């Protein structure tokens, strides 16, 4: 049992939390417990991470990626299946989950890839996997990708989507007509690529759009029944950072002009999900032009600092990083500090403002685009009532069947 300033039902209250068998039994002013310093927030959910491993384990592994998530106040990550090899069949899915079962510091779920090799049999693949594991979504589906097998055209996506009522499809929306194949440089990935793809896709169905980076795309989705996520780097960095970061700046979709960046941040309350798109590469690979940023460890701390300073509200932050991801992807028992839910929370001392330094982070890639940014990292992280940070305990679970 712990006591402190708990974020409960949309506001902070002085209360205690009693935990039994990993779940919250009671919350109230009369509940006794160990007093903690700072605010007690729901632990975050990052629905978009690329934990590499397999043939790219020199960049990141499931073990190092989930350790990084733990230190960032995240209790559950959703890994993307565009690995090498891609997770587009049951055997590869089971192999990756078996690897995760032995090594995760936080809870772990894995999406299923939609490829040109598997789209005709994805139903049977999904049924086989679902006998053992909970699959949050099909995706991230790439409308544009350097791999011909991973690049799915609109017609194929529409055909598959219509066969799977109730399944979440997550989309990387960049129209291939506007993207130079094989080039990660932002000059060749025009903002029109995202806008055009979103305009077409919202007419085809209800999707969850990954890493939206332009105001026009966001407005289009807001007028539909789809949902979308935005990354910290698309709200806190811009093309102006190219001079500071050099080749490190490469990311898909690319960093945008200040107009888009400022609109997304001003409208943070209107987005559905805050997700990191944690996509680590070594410095050597980045210098060679690889696209992607690490971010699972810095996302929550960056935005806790912004909330502490009044730029955003804690209510909005908790919605975007915890309760909305749980609702959209069906993670029952996650996302809110509430009786019956898992006792997953993070304690942040708002007076402990640090500067982000790569050498203190835990991702295997060894760098961050947010070097020198102010952040508030968690002092304690609880997963099903166990405090994990002090001893870096591997207490995570893989999500089995339906949560």
UniProtKB/Swiss-Prot annotation:
Binds 2 Zn(2+) ions per subunit. One of its GO terms (cellular component) is cytoplasm. The keyword rRNA-binding does not apply. Substrate binds at residues 50-52, 82, 281. One of its GO terms (molecular function) is zinc ion binding. Gene3D superfamilies: Metal-dependent hydrolases (3.20.20.140). Its cofactor is Zn(2+). Zn(2+) 2 binds at residues 140, 172, 211. It is an enzyme of class 3 (hydrolase). The active site is at 277. Keywords: Hydrolase, Metal-binding, Pyrimidine biosynthesis, Zinc. Pfam families: Amidohydro_1. It catalyses: (S)-dihydroorotate + H2O = N-carbamoyl-L-aspartate + H(+). Zn(2+) 1 binds at residues 48, 50, 140, 277. GO terms for biological process: 'de novo' UMP biosynthetic process; purine nucleobase catabolic process. Catalyzes the reversible cyclization of carbamoyl aspartate to dihydroorotate. Belongs to the metallo-dependent hydrolases superfamily. DHOase family. Class I DHOase subfamily. This is Dihydroorotase. It comes from Archaeoglobus fulgidus (strain ATCC 49558 / DSM 4304 / JCM 9628 / NBRC 100126 / VC-16).
